[in-house]
Amino acid sequence: MRSHDFHEREKKLVQAFRHPPRALNPFLITERHDEKQLCISSRNLHISDFTLLKTLGTGTFARVWLARLKDQTDRTKVYALKILRKADVIKLKQVEHVRNERKSLAAIVDHPFITTLIASFSDEQSLYMLLDFCPGGEIFTYLRRARRFDEETSRIYAAEITMTIEFLHDVHGIAYRDLKPENILLDADGHIKLVDFGFAKQVDNRETYTLCGTPEYLAPEVIHNSGHGLAVDWWALGILIYEFLVGQPPFWDQNPMRIYEQIVEGHLRFPPNMPPAAQNIVTLLCKTNPTERLGYISGGSTRVKSHPFFADIAWDDLFYRRVKGPIIPRVSHPADTGNFEEYPDSDTRNQNIYTDDLKKKFEPLFKDF
């Protein structure tokens, strides 16, 4: 088949992407992976195939755009296109994290609460990941607007996060390592989508030592640099439940070093109106000793789901999206970006250059794109 034919074929695969009409059983997600024509590492797609419509988010070395295929007849079909400049990735020592992100997302397709990697590709200067677009925006925005969530909203979103952690840990041995409201989007139906797998890593039952994450959500063992594993995600879930109900994380200060001190001390202070079951699950999830932490042992997600805080959750109904999302975003059309912040245009001045020397050393590491 000629290169042009491959190009047209891969564009058609991208155009054909549809969310499954209903969530798959977690085991089918894994079993059917090889049958899927998603997560393709394309040698034929190019940035010139897309129209970049609006910036959805920015980071230190990446920018996410709302994008559309130029020759697509369905004008409502849009995607989130993550663009990472190779030179910036190298300068900021993020090569391993970027590779882990693509590897992790490629292993996961059709999970109801995880963003879908449709395709990846690269060119001389940049790496690209084409993802599904979640028009609801960050759950962070809704939390700040409401100041705090009520107990039922907090419970449902915590349950969806719990099932996501369960899947990553028990099926793939992946530690997500960056759980926070900014990395949780809402789809049009008000259900979560976990995004940004830049710190995700397959650790299984081993320990890793990379210091990564956001200060308020770091587990004590990460701060101690004593080796950490899957248990860090259960700690972060406890922090999130607290933040959903109270409006701010339990450990916070203007000075990050003071945040670290508070986390290591581990003294949780609960407002008097916080429900007892919520206080208890946060206390169990935020044990400073990871071996004592709820969810720590193999299959420990079952113990998390069995906690009284989740007593009213119908787990299958929630997973298969038979339960209505507690917050329904205002979305007027499929390409609506009204739930996202405005971002300035990217500054192309003083950009790092992907030199021939860098290319010789690092290009083999980007081959999976």
Model-based region annotation:
Residues 120:
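Activation-segment/catalytic-loop signature of the eukaryotic protein kinase fold
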Residues 278, 319-369:
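Eukaryotic Ser/Thr kinase distal regulatory-tail detector
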